[in-house]
């Protein structure tokens, strides 16, 4: 029925225990990839001839600070250093900077761009299967910050890119050259040369003792001069007279000395600088205390006096009025309009014996004393 070969397989299946679990299972063997296998799984470098331009805020960062750690199945495969102004990831070798060999990755998939504020941003370039930052899919042409330690994935690729930052590279000093050619020590009297020489030593991280025996001998001879130069270096503000010069004379107030009060430079002919410094000079008079007003006002208009008040003051200065109601009806204007008026004062026709008394009555006030 089974045949010879089929019977042998049937007997073997009865004797074997394919689903049995032993008490001591064999240890799991971890596979370690050889360097040759790892080199085959490293990210390929493309030609980088894409026409895509990064935003204006993109900069070229300092080398060695940021990098992408390529991880697959818990094993680090590669490390991509982010030291360019743009890093385009995709499947096309000619246009991309880093080539991803996966069928779900677009030709120009995404770009990693350093920001001028020191952070890293990821921009999706319209990929078909998406770009993911911390398992969140990005919107097309929308920059999203990739923080340190977050994951970056492209489409259905199983590779995970983790952002790493090397803070020591930000403040690391460049290694000093193997041989340093220093000029001979300058003369101590030349202060500018001494400062330039000390600046050169500080640039290479050297002290005066390490720069050579000749400099050490010079330091022993001119120890006091070096102390003076050090104190002068600490002074932030220096005046011309401290360096052997002369200060320019400034016209102004002095302690009882007679000085000129006219503004302007010294030893310059009057009128030669007209129009150059005229706008810089302004004279303001500030009176001390209250100034008594003049009792007599002669001509002109005082400040704060209206035209109507000025007209009333001018009418008072014309002398005595011809009528007792001239102030109310405009004085002469009413008399010219109606001729002789009852408001005008008529002269007496003839003098009587009581003429003296009449003159006194006319001179008296209307309402009496």
UniProtKB/Swiss-Prot annotation:
Protein name, UniProt field: Protein phosphatase 1 regulatory inhibitor subunit PPP1R8 homolog
Subunit structure and binding partners: Interacts with human protein phosphatase PPP1C.
Taxonomy, superkingdom: Eukaryota
Location of region: Disordered: 1-26, 345-369
Compositional bias per record (Polar residues), positions renumbered to this chain: 13-23
Species in which this protein is naturally found: Arabidopsis thaliana (Mouse-ear cress)
SUPFAM superfamilies per UniProt: SMAD/FHA domain
Domain FHA: residue ranges: 87-138
Entry keyword Kinase: no
High-level lineage: Eukaryota, Viridiplantae, Streptophyta, Embryophyta, Tracheophyta
Compositional bias segments (type: Acidic residues): 358-369
Molecular function as annotated in GO: protein phosphatase inhibitor activity
């Amino acid at each position: 029925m089974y045949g010879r070969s089929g019977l042998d397989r049937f007997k073997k299946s009865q004797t074997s225990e394919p689903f049995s679990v032993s008490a001591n299972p064999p240890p799991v063997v971890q596979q370690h990839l050889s360097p040759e296998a790892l080199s085959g799984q490293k990210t390929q470098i493309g030609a980088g001839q894409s026409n895509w331009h990064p935003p204006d805020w993109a900069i070229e960062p300092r080398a060695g600070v940021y990098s992408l750690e390529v991880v697959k199945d818990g094993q680090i495969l590669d490390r991509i250093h982010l030291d360019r102004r743009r890093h385009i990831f995709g499947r096309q070798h000619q246009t991309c900077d880093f080539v991803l060999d996966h069928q779900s990755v677009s030709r120009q998939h995404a770009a990693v761009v350093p920001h001028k504020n020191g952070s890293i941003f990821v921009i999706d370039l319209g990929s078909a299967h998406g770009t993911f930052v911390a398992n969140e899919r990005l919107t097309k042409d929308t920059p999203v910050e990739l923080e340190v330690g977050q994951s970056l994935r492209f489409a259905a690729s199983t590779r995970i890119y983790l952002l790493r930052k090397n803070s020591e590279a930000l403040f690391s000093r460049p290694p000093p050259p193997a041989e340093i050619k220093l000029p001979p020590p300058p003369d101590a009297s030349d202060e500018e040369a001494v400062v330039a020489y000390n600046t050169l030593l500080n640039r290479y991280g050297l002290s005066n003792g390490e720069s050579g025996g000749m400099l050490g001998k010079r330091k022993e001879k001119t120890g006091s001069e070096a102390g003076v130069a050090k104190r002068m270096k600490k002074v932030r503000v220096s005046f011309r007279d401290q360096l052997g010069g002369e200060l320019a004379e400034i016209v102004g107030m002095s302690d009882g000395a007679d000085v000129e009060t006219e503004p302007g430079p010294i030893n310059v002919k009057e009128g030669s600088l007209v129009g150059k410094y005229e706008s810089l000079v302004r004279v303001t008079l500030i009176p001390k205390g209250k100034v008594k007003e003049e009792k007599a006002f002669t001509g002109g208009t005082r400040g704060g006096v209206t035209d109507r008040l000025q007209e009333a003051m001018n009418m008072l200065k014309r002398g005595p009025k011809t009528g007792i109601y001239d102030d109310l009806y405009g004085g002469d204007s009413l008399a010219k309009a109606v001729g002789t008026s009852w408001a005008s004062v008529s002269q007496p026709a003839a003098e009587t014996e009581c003429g003296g008394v009449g003159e006194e009555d006319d001179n008296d006030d209307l309402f009496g004393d």
